[in-house]
Amino acid sequence: MMKFALKAVTFGVLTAGSTMVMAEDAPSFYGITATGSVAATTDYRFRGVTQSSNNPAIQGGFTFSHKSGAYLSLWGSSVDFGVTGNSTETDVALGYTNTLKLSDTLAPTYDVGIIHYGYIGAGHSFDRNGIGYDGKNGLDFNEVYGKLTFANSLLKGDAISVGVNYSDDYWANSKQFWYFNIGYSAPIADTGFTGLASVGYNKFRNKDALAVVAGGLVKMIAILIIKWA
């Protein structure tokens, strides 16, 4: 989580984790399907900043999708920012996805929506390492997003995605925030694994408020993450 424009780049490999996805071919009820996932990861990182103080995290979520393209997602994870009173993140997203036919050969999938990031038990003010923080919304914030995904772009089964996220009062009262990202995924032969790479640029208005909670680990804007799932 972040919201300012520093000129630093970081590269990394996503920490190992295991994920179980349920109901791949979920039955439909009145046009609605439900899918879920459970994951255990050695470190929960969000846009380059650890959300679990470099410790393991347990995560899980459900998505309810309608045949029209509308969906509702519920997701949660254990978190640890090194402050008293918060150990759980709960996110709720409401969105819409469909195909945008640009030509006979170009039809990307678009995904737009709004998401609420909630942090149960997080207070509106606290002190970390002698640095005070006082924000009207605590750690909670809302964000709107949009993404285009181009399937089978370079290889069969691959995908290129470009997206943008915006919040008018980002995490820890760090004010206006923009996040731009591009990603690529492709199957690894016939192994059943998928390789993914992504680059993101985070622009914040108020980096100082974020640094209090993130413990100063915010000197990064462009992030390259390579992971296998």
Enumerate the predicted regions with their spans.
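Cleavable N-terminal export/targeting peptides
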Residues: 1-33
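Short loop/turn motifs that connect adjacent beta-strands in outer-membrane beta-barrel proteins
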Residues: 22-33, 69, 99-109, 136, ...
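Short glycine/proline- and aromatic-enriched beta-strand/turn motifs that initiate or cap beta-hairpins
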Residues: 24-80
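Residues that define the transmembrane beta-barrel architecture of outer-membrane proteins
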Residues: 30-32, 54-58, 86-90, 108, ...
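Transmembrane beta-strands of outer-membrane beta-barrel proteins
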Residues: 34-40, 60, 70-74, 92, ...
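Transmembrane beta-strands of outer-membrane beta-barrel pores
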Residues: 40-46, 76-80, 98, 114-121, ...
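Outer-membrane beta-barrel translocator domains and adjoining extracellular loop/strand segments
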Residues: 46-53, 83-89, 122-137, 167-177, ...
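Surface-exposed loop and membrane-interface regions of Gram-negative outer-membrane beta-barrel proteins
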Residues: 67-137
